[in-house]
Regions:
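N-terminal nicking endonuclease/strand-transfer module with a His-rich metal-binding environment
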Residues: 1-155
């Protein structure tokens, strides 16, 4: 993790130590003989300047957002403060540390996650929209390689 992007060190994980995330996720994949194909999911949640007071609040949002998958999948996040707006990168091991099954990535799960995120956003007085950038619009997966979920506006 780059300290220039995370000066306040808001980095965390569930079922994995963030400093050793790559190695620990690889070990889970190997233990279940699932070390081929796509094994990681990456997405970003970004915030407008007026939506959250500071990086601490983005960290609180990120911790809550991770809990949706934390009982089944290793997940790590990092709050980036180096841009005009705060944003959080998430990386999830698609191989379950509980049973070795691969994350299915079905649309129902995506929409359940969006609903869950909206419940969190409600606590912060904002709401979630899905934003497609040029790269993710070419990908049919709800969590494209560059998929972005963005809270937008105060309620």
């Amino acid at each position: 993790m780059r300290s220039d992007k995370t000066p306040d060190h808001y980095i965390g994980g569930f079922a994995v130590h963030p400093q050793y995330a790559a190695e620990e996720m690889q070990l889970v994949s190997q233990a279940y003989h699932q070390d081929r194909g796509v094994r990681l999911r990456h997405w970003i949640i970004s915030f407008e300047k007026h939506e959250l007071a500071d990086a601490w609040h983005a960290n609180q949002f990120a911790q809550m957002a991770c809990r949706f998958y934390a009982d089944t999948y290793q997940i790590v996040y990092s709050v980036h403060e180096d841009a005009e707006h705060l944003h959080v990168h998430f990386v999830m091991n698609m191989i379950s540390y509980q049973n070795g099954k691969r994350y299915s990535g079905q649309k129902k799960d995506f929409y359940d996650y969006l609903k869950y995120l909206q419940e969190i956003a409600d606590l912060f007085g904002t709401y979630i929209i899905r934003v497609k950038d040029d790269l993710s619009s070419q990908n049919t997966s709800p969590f494209g390689a560059n998929g972005r979920l963005r809270p937008l506006g105060k309620r």
